[in-house]
């Protein structure tokens, strides 16, 4: 089973399935959905004990958040939502649970065959994004 340290590094998006549908479920407008769907972001994850930082860089936008595992924090997402978020590490996966305006979404990052698989879920919309390590 992967450790949190195994997720550290720079990851590049290689495949994406269902991302536009997931963004639509989040309430993201059409223009931003189209731009975001074309972006090929890098995800940089760093860990220092229980503190993690996740930075997502693309030509469209760069976002970053840092948190302590298990502690709620205020996050501003790439699409501008203000969420109350908590990250945990369970069963070899980094789980990011967001809540806002009575809604919720979960983003799970895990390793499979040397790739980082990111699964985003809101209601019945599920998106799977596959990243390869570049550093």
Swiss-Prot record:
<feature type="disulfide bond">
    <location>
        <begin position="120"/>
        <end position="127"/>
    </location>
</feature>
<dbReference type="Pfam" id="PF00061">
    <property type="entry name" value="Lipocalin"/>
</dbReference>
<dbReference type="GO" id="GO:0098978">
    <property type="term" value="C:glutamatergic synapse"/>
</dbReference>
<keyword id="KW-0963">Cytoplasm</keyword>
<dbReference type="GO" id="GO:0120162">
    <property type="term" value="P:positive regulation of cold-induced thermogenesis"/>
</dbReference>
<comment type="similarity">
    <text>Belongs to the calycin superfamily. Fatty-acid binding protein (FABP) family.</text>
</comment>
<keyword id="KW-0964">Secreted</keyword>
<dbReference type="GO" id="GO:0035360">
    <property type="term" value="P:positive regulation of peroxisome proliferator activated receptor signaling pathway"/>
</dbReference>
<dbReference type="GO" id="GO:0005504">
    <property type="term" value="F:fatty acid binding"/>
</dbReference>
<feature type="modified residue" description="Phosphotyrosine">
    <location>
        <position position="131"/>
    </location>
</feature>
<feature type="short sequence motif" description="Nuclear localization signal">
    <location>
        <begin position="24"/>
        <end position="34"/>
    </location>
</feature>
<dbReference type="GO" id="GO:0014069">
    <property type="term" value="C:postsynaptic density"/>
</dbReference>
<dbReference type="GO" id="GO:0031392">
    <property type="term" value="P:regulation of prostaglandin biosynthetic process"/>
</dbReference>
<dbReference type="GO" id="GO:0051930">
    <property type="term" value="P:regulation of sensory perception of pain"/>
</dbReference>
<dbReference type="GO" id="GO:0099092">
    <property type="term" value="C:postsynaptic density, intracellular component"/>
</dbReference>
<keyword id="KW-1015">Disulfide bond</keyword>
<dbReference type="GO" id="GO:0010829">
    <property type="term" value="P:negative regulation of D-glucose transmembrane transport"/>
</dbReference>
<feature type="modified residue" description="N-acetylalanine">
    <location>
        <position position="2"/>
    </location>
</feature>
<protein>
    <recommendedName>
        <fullName>Fatty acid-binding protein 5</fullName>
    </recommendedName>
</protein>
<dbReference type="InterPro" id="IPR000463">
    <property type="entry name" value="Fatty_acid-bd"/>
</dbReference>
<feature type="binding site">
    <location>
        <position position="43"/>
    </location>
    <ligand>
        <name>1-eicosanoylglycerol</name>
    </ligand>
</feature>
<dbReference type="GO" id="GO:0006629">
    <property type="term" value="P:lipid metabolic process"/>
</dbReference>
<feature type="binding site">
    <location>
        <position position="131"/>
    </location>
    <ligand>
        <name>N-eicosanoyl ethanolamine</name>
    </ligand>
</feature>
<keyword id="KW-0597">Phosphoprotein</keyword>
<feature type="binding site">
    <location>
        <begin position="129"/>
        <end position="131"/>
    </location>
    <ligand>
        <name>1-eicosanoylglycerol</name>
    </ligand>
</feature>
<keyword id="KW-0445">Lipid transport</keyword>
<keyword id="KW-0813">Transport</keyword>
<feature type="binding site">
    <location>
        <position position="109"/>
    </location>
    <ligand>
        <name>1-eicosanoylglycerol</name>
    </ligand>
</feature>
<dbReference type="GO" id="GO:0042802">
    <property type="term" value="F:identical protein binding"/>
</dbReference>
<dbReference type="GO" id="GO:0006006">
    <property type="term" value="P:glucose metabolic process"/>
</dbReference>
<dbReference type="GO" id="GO:0005615">
    <property type="term" value="C:extracellular space"/>
</dbReference>
<feature type="modified residue" description="Phosphoserine">
    <location>
        <position position="3"/>
    </location>
</feature>
<dbReference type="GO" id="GO:0005324">
    <property type="term" value="F:long-chain fatty acid transmembrane transporter activity"/>
</dbReference>
<dbReference type="InterPro" id="IPR000566">
    <property type="entry name" value="Lipocln_cytosolic_FA-bd_dom"/>
</dbReference>
<dbReference type="InterPro" id="IPR012674">
    <property type="entry name" value="Calycin"/>
</dbReference>
<feature type="binding site">
    <location>
        <position position="131"/>
    </location>
    <ligand>
        <name>hexadecanoate</name>
    </ligand>
</feature>
<comment type="subunit">
    <text>Monomer.</text>
</comment>
<keyword id="KW-0446">Lipid-binding</keyword>
<keyword id="KW-0539">Nucleus</keyword>
<keyword id="KW-0770">Synapse</keyword>
<dbReference type="GO" id="GO:1990379">
    <property type="term" value="P:lipid transport across blood-brain barrier"/>
</dbReference>
<keyword id="KW-0007">Acetylation</keyword>
